[in-house]
A protein has these predicted regions:
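N-terminal intrinsically disordered/low-complexity leader segments
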Residues: 1-16, 177, 202
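Helix-turn-helix
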Residues: 20, 24, 28-62, 66
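An amphipathic alpha-helix signature
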Residues: 22, 65, 97, 134-145, ...
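Hydrophobic alpha-helical connector segments
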Residues: 62, 66, 77-109, 160-164
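Short, basic, alpha-helical segments at the C-terminal edge of helix-turn-helix-like DNA-binding modules
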Residues: 69-75
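Amphipathic alpha-helical packing segments from all-alpha helical-bundle domains
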Residues: 76-77, 81, 104-113, 123-149, ...
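Hydrophobic/aromatic-rich alpha-helical bundle segments in the mid-to-C-terminal region
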Residues: 125-130, 147-202
Length: 202
């Protein structure tokens, strides 16, 4: 079997431009929302010409369709960065909340919610979005289970994981609506206390 040749400089530049456009699309989604995100805003953020954008993505819809998988790439990178920052004595609850937050909160979380809502009436894109987010969520659950190990009962860990995912997504929506940040922090703190009890061994 012949090994794949490394990309040449032209290919590398093309891949960089593509990534810049997709990153800019996610940033614009987080800042402006799907309805207000324009091609001109995306190209300006990416620092590329409209011609370069058309070369990679002919339409706005095509660009956002590819942004779905790119979002997962960035979520996975954020997850792995957080894993690398975990201290050896990090508690199971802090592992759980920290990893879920790294994956589903912040700017990436906002971009994901915008994509969810914008694809509500497009069956194909909605299916793609649901599939990709399900895959990263299952990967996240597996990672949490591996890191936490047998320090918490498996059934409780899975239940606490899914509740944490829903809570973090909910606080992200709350942030997008401009609600009270102190209240969001209090909600997460309250959940940290409850989750600690849920994961405690008998």
């Amino acid at each position: 079997v012949t090994a794949a040749l490394p990309p040449n400089k032209h290919q590398e530049k093309s891949l960089r431009t593509r990534a810049l456009l997709l990153d800019a699309a996610l940033d614009s989604l987080a800042d402006r929302g799907y309805g207000n995100t324009s091609i001109s805003d995306i190209t300006a953020r990416a620092g590329v010409t409209r011609g370069a954008q058309v070369h990679h993505f002919h339409t706005r819809t095509e660009l956002f369709a590819h942004a779905i998988d790119h979002l997962v790439v960035r979520q996975r990178e954020s997850l792995h960065r957080h894993i690398g920052q975990l201290a050896p004595d990090t508690t199971p609850v802090e592992v759980l909340i920290g990893l879920v937050t790294a994956t589903f909160a912040g700017r990436l979380g906002k971009a994901a919610i915008e994509l969810y809502s914008s694809f509500a009436t497009d069956d194909e894109l909605r299916h793609t979005m649901l599939r990709s987010q399900h895959e990263i969520t299952i990967e996240l659950l597996s990672t949490c289970t591996e890191l936490i190990g047998d320090t918490a009962p498996r059934d409780r860990l899975e239940s606490t994981f899914w509740l944490t995912v829903n809570l973090i997504r909910g606080t992200t929506v709350d942030e997008m609506l401009g609600r009270d940040e102190r209240r969001r922090r209090q909600v997460v703190d309250d959940w940290r206390t409850l989750a600690t009890l849920a994961l405690a061994t008998d």
